[in-house]
Amino acid sequence: MTDQENNNNISSNPFAALFGSLADAKQFAAIQKEQLKQQSDELPASPDDSDNSVSESLDEFDYSVAEISRSFRSQQEICEQLNINHMIQRIFLITLDNSDPSLKSGNGIPSRCVYLEEMAVELEDQDWLDMSNVEQALFARLLLQDPGNHLINMTSSTTLNLSADRDAGERHIFCYLYSCFQRAKEEITKVPENLLPFAVQCRNLTVSNTRTVLLTPEIYVDQNIHEQLVDLMLEAIQGAHFEDVTEFLEEVIEALILDEEVRTFPEVMIPVFDILLGRIKDLELCQILLYAYLDILLYFTRQKDMAKVFVEYIQPKDPTNGQMYQKTLLGVILSISCLLKTPGVVENHGYFLNPSRSSPQEIKVQEANIHQFMAQFHEKIYQMLKNLLQLSPETKHCILSWLGNCLHANAGRTKIWANQMPEIFFQMYASDAFFLNLGAALLKLCQPFCKPRSSRLLTFNPTYCALKELNDEERKIKNVHMRGLDKETCLIPAVQEPKFPQNYNLVTENLALTEYTLYLGFHRLHDQMVKINQNLHRLQVAWRDAQQSSSPAADNLREQFERLMTIYLSTKTAMTEPQMLQNCLNLQVSMAVLLVQLAIGNEGSQPIELTFPLPDGYSSLAYVPEFFADNLGDFLIFLRRFADDILETSADSLEHVLHFITIFTGSIERMKNPHLRAKLAEVLEAVMPHLDQTPNPLVSSVFHRKRVFCNFQYAPQLAEALIKVFVDIEFTGDPHQFEQKFNYRRPMYPILRYMWGTDTYRESIKDLADYASKNLEAMNPPLFLRFLNLLMNDAIFLLDEAIQYLSKIKIQQIEKDRGEWDSLTPEARREKEAGLQMFGQLARFHNIMSNETIGTLAFLTSEIKSLFVHPFLAERIISMLNYFLQHLVGPKMGALKVKDFSEFDFKPQQLVSDICTIYLNLGDEENFCATVPKDGRSYSPTLFAQTVRVLKKINKPGNMIMAFSNLAERIKSLADLQQQEEETYADACDEFLDPIMSTLMCDPVVLPSSRVTVDRSTIARHLLSDQTDPFNRSPLTMDQIRPNTELKEKIQRWLAERKQQKEQLE
């Protein structure tokens, strides 16, 4: 029978309709033939069988209706077998049948399959796949080095189908198995119920074979299995079908966990992390690809088994070497930033190159673009950490240990030498970018309890910071992973060992980790920013000078300026991402609340109201490291300098900061370190409204801050705290205290000026002055009296120093203009230039400070008079004012006429105006006017006449000039009278003269230990600065001195006699 007849017979068979196609029916018949052949071979020959029509028809391919009907008893099984074959072909895209495609139907058959020739030969006549050989077939497919060379058409279609070729000929076996898994999933949803177990079995085969591939990757030639896994995940993220891939991976991971005989699960997965490490380390912050890789890691940190491998994988080889943490996978991620990778090297840096050629708007756009990436980047890192903390106690312990060990190994970043030796620094410690990013992520973890009224916030237990070294098991039990905090200096010394709880909550640990990270990172970078800013200013001045003088160094200076500006803009951008700043402000405001609650002895979880006077019970502060408060202050100062708008938009939170400043600035019992307390004055300056704010109609600028500051409930206590710290920093015990105190007091002057302009603060200051006036001879000098004494000390020293520096600058400028420097060697000339620059910087500093001190005295004397005119202070302030007038309006003023007053912040007109204002404020007091002529060193009627002339020259108001002229006349009259009296008393014996001042004593007193008699006003002035006997250094207070009544009476009798003698002579 011909093929055509055979086909016709089958097509006319009514049972053929049960098959999907004519080819299927033919295949069924072939199977029947094979089975019958096998049966006939096994049975002995029989005459009856020789005429068997079925056998004959099979031999002759004669498929009659009767013959097919007789074999239908196995039709259902055979049909199922054919369907299994097709299903296997659809799932795995493999086949054993390479017959003519035209004889195959396209119904249910893939258009392209890989023909497994060797297996087909091995199975001889079987050209179908079933559940008994599918595993072997799949394995054979996986071993093919180039499956694309084995593709065959399964249908007669001639249409080019590239996707079918790609899918069937997929060379990467991991991707191939994943695709098989997806096709098996689809089959499960479509196949009849009787085929469902086989579809599930095929799906399981993809998983088990993927497990095998990962366990024994070496047997698959030219296949980088782990690369393929990463690429598959990467493609899934970019193609938005990541959940499908993770479903597949979950099953593979489960299979690997159950079979660790060949390789452990970590051994299998570590190469994946190696690949991620190698790829991520070369990526930049603003590359989209980076975020796809981070999403892969986010999945790994959510998957419990992968997360365990991850936390083990990131452990550094040497946990004591801080820099090693940066080389781990997590460390590499944390090191990605817009900061320079190699400090000082701007070549190949991708941000803010040639900034002078960019407009401010272009720079702002680039900054905003970087900030968008930073916000996304920090969110990814935060989610990774959060996943690990929440996944299991094991991963939580591991990641917290990593963080704690990392911070401890990098503790040296805060040492002074570290900043002075950068080449060693970067070999020993992780980078600034590392800690900036880690800080940003940890800040996000803290946000749930970073609310001022959060009950969780007050569950922080400061004794955590006092714990000594623990072993790993103890750390796990107690939830303590930070190391070395017990060696940190705390706010106050501890009196006794604290009572430690059995364990600590995550709030405590998070706060400690975050604050220390900010201290190592943000705090240090802020210092860098300030130095860069200063260097930029110096370079700008030098560049401008070089351009004006046509110096060949101009180009070099410009290049230096460009490079430094790139560093500055990169650093500023890295530190000012808005969400990070807001999160940090939330934390620091919460820290202010926490420290205030600890300072008033609150050990509960609910905040209590602040009241004055402060209650006792603040021992918990003995376990709070100073860097908690230092971070708070440092961050607010940073905002004032580089992101002031954040302060204004969060003004309502600043009341909590004012509470903190009020308590700690004025309380040495709660904050022992005078330097830290002095820094709080700078913090106060940072959060208060700007004095020199330029109005901006689009922004409320300082409105909100002004409202908070002016309506502050504890204004009197804040004013007193400020004055107290002004006094306290005079004696810090530091060998450099003399130089330091001026820097510490710099921000205090504008604060005092602002306070004086606000009614509540001004009245508080006046109350302090009134108290001082009534207690001048108290055992301890009143606070405000000591403040005024130090203020005058500063004014005298600062303006005197400024005058000296200006005189030196004047001389050097004359020498330079005359050409005297031209003949010098280049080195000698450089030294001269450097000396002139140094004098200029010193003169500028002293001028700024003296302007502030004299200005402060000018506004204080407008309403506070009694203290200034008291003998304790009057002589000193008068001698100071006259001395300065002598230099500013007298013949000596020519020595101060440098080329450019503004370059050195020298404001002689303002100084003269302020000094005259002080005179006019106090001139109504007769005693004060009478004391002016007693200044024999500087006072003369001519001096005041010269002052009037200068006031006219600088166009001061006429009423001021007239008032000062009248005052000068009154003082001159009193001077004439005093001169006559001095002539009368000129021959006073030494017994009547003050041994210190050599003036006639008015109120002699005896010092208890040295038994020396001095004038009361003299010793009172001395004790304001030094509470010791000036003759033997024994401790001394005003209440210990005794009046020398007998000597006083003798002096008064002698004066009366001299006066009587004079009258008789007249």
Curated annotation (Swiss-Prot):
PROSITE patterns: U_BOX
Enzyme Commission numbers on file: 2.3.2.27
Location of N6-acetyllysine modifications: K386
Record InterPro entries: Ub_conjug_fac_E4_core (IPR019474), UBE4 (IPR045132), Ubox_domain (IPR003613), Znf_RING/FYVE/PHD (IPR013083)
Domain of life: Eukaryota
CDD domains from the UniProt entry: RING-Ubox_UBE4A
Signal peptide: none
Reactions performed catalytically: S-ubiquitinyl-[E2 ubiquitin-conjugating enzyme]-L-cysteine + [acceptor protein]-L-lysine = [E2 ubiquitin-conjugating enzyme]-L-cysteine + N(6)-ubiquitinyl-[acceptor protein]-L-lysine
Record domain U-box: where: 987-1061
PANTHER family named in the record: UBIQUITIN CONJUGATION FACTOR E4 A (PTHR13931:SF16), UBIQUITINATION FACTOR E4 (PTHR13931)
Known function: Ubiquitin-protein ligase that probably functions as an E3 ligase in conjunction with specific E1 and E2 ligases. May also function as an E4 ligase mediating the assembly of polyubiquitin chains on substrates ubiquitinated by another E3 ubiquitin ligase. Mediates 'Lys-48'-linked polyubiquitination of substrates.
Disorder: Neurodevelopmental disorder with hypotonia and gross motor and speech delay: An autosomal recessive disorder characterized by severe global developmental delay apparent from infancy, axial hypotonia, limited or absent ability to walk, impaired intellectual development, and poor or absent speech. Additional features may include seizures, behavioral problems, distal skeletal anomalies, and facial dysmorphism.
This protein's name: Ubiquitin conjugation factor E4 A
Lineage of producing organism: Eukaryota, Metazoa, Chordata, Craniata, Vertebrata
